[in-house]
Swiss-Prot record:
Source species of the chain: Protochlamydia amoebophila (strain UWE25)
Keyword DNA-binding in record: yes
Described purpose of this protein according to its UniProt entry: This protein is involved in the repair of mismatches in DNA. It is possible that it carries out the mismatch recognition step. This protein has a weak ATPase activity.
Key word Membrane present: no
Protein's name according to its UniProt entry: DNA mismatch repair protein MutS
Domain of life of the native organism: Bacteria
HAMAP family: MutS (MF_00096)
Length: 858
């Protein structure tokens, strides 16, 4: 993304060389230059009739990126796209990381003499797309602002498509990074100084996904300016009512972001009607690597939801519910009472399955009312958007009545917020036809009888022959001339024709228009008026419908706050129904959640793997951790035996439990976990000059420096990225640190290949050995995937190599070398560290034989 910004700046430096000699440039191009100056580094789409045109470097860029023809007019490079198909082209550019400024004709060319006025009406960028194929129904599209005041980081993030606006503050850059990884903002706003000082933050995030960064001068984040902008926007006297008292950094970020969107990007922000603050301490902390390693929302394999925790538990019926479930997965709760409320709601729904079935069918009728309402408020809504909103609210009253029959305080509380908004719905249904056109002017939008003049114009436009027949009958009766005819031609328009022998019967108010050989043609004021109506009917229909629709949209927009309250309540209920269905489908049970210090799981299962491998019976496993004798479970066993699956399984069950979900286990009792850390596998970070081992140690250091006695730590194969002795030493000391360091005594699952670490159980209180059971028969093994108590001194590496398909010659030689090592190294006495009570530093006995040298001695 930074390369993209540099590319644009280079284009602009060339562009600035163009002279603006007014004597040599047309008025229209002067207008273009003014718009381009306002657009800045964005590609300018300049409206000219039915096309958007791009000039100079923008034209070159458009031609290259969209493979369009590049032409010239008076030596000015230009390229254009049709107005009606522009959305697809804009989406392609935004997907490539560009910003697109839209300069529209703000006057009607038919009513304007001379040059039509044009202005930049909006700027489209990754974080500001509103009606685009780039948007995912299941994910938010956040635009974030970052500032730092003293030692405090301020974060504000906004989804223009839903109206969600949040702020928070952080004291540690690592905490901020974890939160940004959770949010995945599509675009950032910050100061030049912040971007330069915290470049590593953006660089680290870019390892995961692409985004756009915009910078402003420092003064544009000044507190008083940001504070006043928010006060004026929300029309309040103080920000305390939003919970922002004393949050200087957050206010600076929030005010600067809204100001930037309105003043620089020309975006409507009137639909942003509230701002909410939160603290990351309200939720379980899941750092960046934990979210990634546990595949909470994105698969490591292809980045999709498939084979992730979210993919399993998200069975929501509405887009609002899907987006909320995404947040629930990444923000497990810490308050026991809140978890119990969700649990009780799930149990109540399970007890009323017939109601759940009805609710699901009703929820299918509900569209994305959150985003529909934002389009209404921002004046982007089409007739179809309004009718979709109408049909989405039709089942709300019935949904509410069903929910109020379920004995759950949590469900009833949210059901009460389901206002069917009958007046709003009547506004829409009384005005709009059930199947309106996609856009105004492309067909009938308003109902018959809604507007008298509109009905008359439609009748004129679509039924002129019938009108002429009726009028002819009327005039014949008035004049008594039975042969009188009413006709029309393009040259003279409408006329009344009578034969010459009937001329004396014509009334005085008839006006002679044309004389023919055998007849006379007349017009009347009524016929003249009708002719005028017919000739301008379509234009007038479009004008009236536009006025009516604009007024209707404003009236519906007045219900924005009410609609969003309904949307949020529906989303929460949708999520709870989803968790209910998952619990029923996969036989989950309700865990006991409290503030105790134990973590007990009986017959736990991996929530994702058991759904993927339905053809195999999943082997359940138990877990027992506490803050006394079972603080660290040391798990040994071969690769492919199921250690990593078990580690992830425990972490995922804990996360599910604190979401408020039931869990895949026979029983579970979980004391609140404040943070989950995982160190599972490593990938070389060569782009940043970091080896596998450096990444491993950096992540381990983060865990040791931030874990608490309430945390859950998952460590898989610590120390494997270096030599054997270094690896054993580091793994031992890490385990010992977690067992003995006050305030860091986290509940820990520690999987390792180093059988030497099993000695920890004898030497340090709190360590308990477990291993993955293996069945041996002759020279073959079977992985039982069962975690059992006790250590093991066998790695079965050669057996795993056989399963992987290594040549037999390699396997035979490996076996010879292994026997040689075991014979000569006396491995069982090679590593027996002892702890010094004073220094808590391990002392290691030097091995009697050098493994590596001995291997090559003959």
């Amino acid at each position: 993304m930074f390369i993209f910004q540099l590319k644009i700046s280079l284009f602009m430096s060339d562009f600035e060389q163009h002279s603006l000699d007014e004597s040599k440039i047309s008025p229209m191009m002067m207008q273009w230059h003014a718009c381009k100056k306002m657009a800045g580094d964005a590609i300018l789409f300049f409206r000219m009739g039915d096309f958007y045109e791009a000039f100079y470097e923008d034209a070159h860029l458009l031609s290259k990126e969209l493979e369009l023809t590049l032409t010239k007019r008076q030596e000015i490079p230009m390229s254009g796209i049709p107005f009606h198909t522009s959305e697809g082209y804009i989406d392609k550019l935004v997907a490539k990381g560009f910003r697109v400024a839209i300069a529209e004709q703000i006057e009607d060319p038919k009513k304007t003499k001379g040059l039509v006025k044009r202005e930049v009406v909006r700027v489209v960028s990754p974080g500001t797309v509103i009606n685009s194929s780039l948007l995912s129904d299941k994910n938010n599209n956040f635009f974030a602002a970052l500032v730092k005041v003293g030692q405090i980081f301020g974060l504000a993030f906004l989804d223009l498509t839903t109206g969600e606006y949040w702020v928070s503050e952080f004291t540690q850059e690592r905490e901020l990074l974890n939160e940004l990884y959770r949010l995945h903002p599509a675009e950032f706003l910050t100061s030049e100084k912040f971007k330069e000082k915290h470049a590593s933050l953006f660089e680290e995030m870019q390892q995961t996904y692409s985004f756009l960064v915009n910078t402003l001068e420092d003064w544009q984040f000044e507190h008083q300016q940001a504070h006043d902008f928010l006060i004026n926007h929300f029309k309040v006297q103080r920000l305390d009512g939003f919970g922002l008292s004393g949050m200087v950094a957050a206010i600076n970020a929030a005010g600067a972001l809204l100001n930037y969107l309105q003043e620089t990007l020309c975006l409507p922000i009137q639909h942003i009607q509230s701002i909410r603050c939160y603290s990351s301490s309200q939720f379980m902390m899941l750092d960046r690597m934990t979210q990634r390693n546990l595949e909470l929302t994105h698969s490591l394999q292809d980045g999709s939801r498939r084979h992730t925790l979210l993919g399993v538990i998200d069975q929501t019926q509405t887009p609002m519910g899907a987006r909320l479930m995404h947040h629930w997965v990444k923000q497990p709760l810490l308050k026991v009472s809140e978890i119990h409320q969700r649990q009780n709601g799930i149990q109540a729904l399970l007890n009323h399955e017939h109601i759940v079935d009805q609710l699901q069918n009703l929820f299918l009728q509900i569209k994305d009312i959150e985003r529909l309402m934002m389009k209404v408020s921002a004046c982007y809504a089409t007739p179809r958007d309004l009718i979709a909103l109408h049909f989405s609210f039709k089942p709300i009253a019935f949904i509410k009545s069903l929910l109020l029959n379920i004995p759950s305080e949590w469900i009833n509380e949210h059901a009460q917020k389901l206002d069917p908004l009958s007046k709003m719905n009547a506004l829409i249904s009384n005005a709009i036809v059930e199947e309106p056109p996609l856009r105004l002017g492309e067909g009938k939008t308003f109902r018959q009888g809604f507007h008298r003049e509109l009905d008359e114009l439609r009748e004129i436009s679509h039924d002129s022959k019938a009108w002429m027949a009726r009028y002819q009958t009327q005039i014949r009766e008035e004049t008594g001339i039975k042969t009188l005819k009413v006709g029309f031609n393009k040259m003279f328009g409408y006329f009344i024709e009578v034969s010459r022998g009937q001329i004396d019967k014509m009334p005085d108010h008839f006006i002679r228009r044309q004389t023919l050989v055998n007849a006379e043609r007349y017009i009347t004021p009524e016929l003249k008026e009708y002719e005028s109506k017919v000739l301008t009917a379509e234009e007038r229909i479009n004008s009236i419908e536009s006025e009516l629709f604009h007024q209707l949209r404003l009236e519906v927009a007045s219900y924005t706050k009410n609609v969003l309250e309904v949307a949020q309540a529906l989303a929460k209920i949708d999520c709870l129904i989803s968790l209910t269905n998952v619990a029923k489908k996969y036989c989950y049970t309700c865990p006991v959640i409290d503030d105790s210090s134990i973590l007990v799981i009986e017959e736990g299962r991996h929530p994702v793997i058991e759904t993927v491998c339905r053809h195999e019976k999943f082997i359940p496993n138990d877990t027992y951790l506490d803050d006394q004798a079972n603080r660290l479970l040391l798990i040994t066993g071969p690769n492919m035996a199921g250690k990593s699956t078990y580690l992830r399984q425990v972490a995922l069950i804990v996360i599910l439990a604190q979401i408020g979900s039931f869990v895949p286990a026979a029983k579970a009792h979980i004391g609140i976990i404040d943070k989950v850390f995982t160190r599972i596998g490593a990938s070389d970070d060569l782009s940043r000059g970091q080896s596998t081992f450096m990444v491993e140690m950096t992540e381990t250091a983060n865990i040791l420096n931030n874990a608490t006695s309430q945390s859950l730590v998952i460590l898989d194969e610590i120390g494997r990225g270096t030599s054997t002795y270094d690896g054993i030493s580091i793994a031992w000391s890490v385990a010992e640190y977690l067992l003995t360091t006050e305030k860091r005594m986290a509940k820990t699952l520690f999987a390792t290949h180093y059988w030497e670490l099993t000695k920890l159980e004898e030497k340090v209180p709190g360590a308990v050995n477990y291993n993955v059971a293996v069945h041996e028969a002759d020279d073959h093994i079977t992985f039982l995937r069962k975690i059992i108590k006790g250590g093991t001194d066998k790695s079965y590496g050669i057996h795993v190599a056989r399963l992987a398909g290594l040549p037999q010659a390699v396997l035979n030689r490996s076996k010879e070398i292994l026997e040689h090592l075991e014979e000569n190294a006396n491995r069982k006495s090679a590593f027996e560290p002892t702890r010094s009570k004073k220094s808590m530093v391990s002392k290691v006995k030097v091995p009697s034989t050098d493994f590596q040298l001995n291997l090559f001695q003959s």
